Amino acid sequence: MRLRDVIPAALTLTCLPAVTASPAYVDKQRPREVKKRDSPVLAGYNADPNIAVFGNTYYIYPTTDGFPDWGGQTFYWWKSTDLATWTRSAEPFLTLNGSSGNVPWATGNAWAPTIIERYGKYYFYFSGQNPTYNRKTIGVAVANSPEGPFTAQSKAMILNNEALTSGQAIDSAAFLDPETNKYYLYWGNGSPLLAELSDDMLSIKTSTLQAPTGLTDFREGSFMIYRQGVYHMTYSIDDTRSEDYRVGYATGPSATGPFTYRGVILQKDASKGILATGHNSIVNVPGTDDWYIAYHRFAIPNGNGTMRETTIDRLYFDDEGLIVPVVPTLESVAPLGS
């Protein structure tokens, strides 16, 4: 049974009815909108946000949260033109429910996706429970638009039985290296892994599979950006059920490292009720040096490791080109251009 969306009182919402439904339920009502600038920026329980920009539109692809044992089965997209007002897709674009869904190999645990564009196609990587192997595996779905429709491949592409393995094959993050024009996928739980993506983006080049070094206290949630000749890797430390879940940071001379640990750049502020700040992604406003970080935290109030909400804050660099520790806020960010 799907849990009812919980809408924090700080939000002003329109057309946002609470619903209780089975995982197969398809919400055909018109898209949801968040009108107010206060956080969270996405209504209800959403975690592991992957923020991206395509053209003039920003997208967040999150884990649909609020289920025991992170048992959500659906992926939705959210979109915005100003990073403050977000509209959700009226229907899930992927449902991980075996033959009742549209991802043949997966039965639930729709977790931590990432998306990237290549040659006009959009590749959406995600993890799910794979009953064939009785573990989490990573798959890919393809579309001609960031809003879909997406077609999932019939089998998972990373099975966690490769030459190098991690605790779980989860938390993928796709990255285009602007220096080499190579496409990479990062993933892992307990130990980080990366590999170059194949030319068709549907598998990894197994000869490039490696475990990057220098990611002190790595737990999960890798994310890579590039700025002014430096590769910036962020990742999550501790357990998502812990209020001390936080974001670690390392830099390197290439997309594969070696990386130098730079410390923690995002952590809780208990004085504000902000706890378990982790599993981030980062986006640059095209044509500027303005950067933003999306991440989840325990829902306020009374959230926990399966009741998480997504917010956005500004991200800055110092004079040496390193990320400055992020100040988590309850206000989130002003609309772009305001």
Q: What are the functions of these language-model segments?
A:
Residues 1-34:
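Fungal secretory targeting signals
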Residues 22-338:
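Carbohydrate-active catalytic/glycan-binding domains of CAZyme proteins
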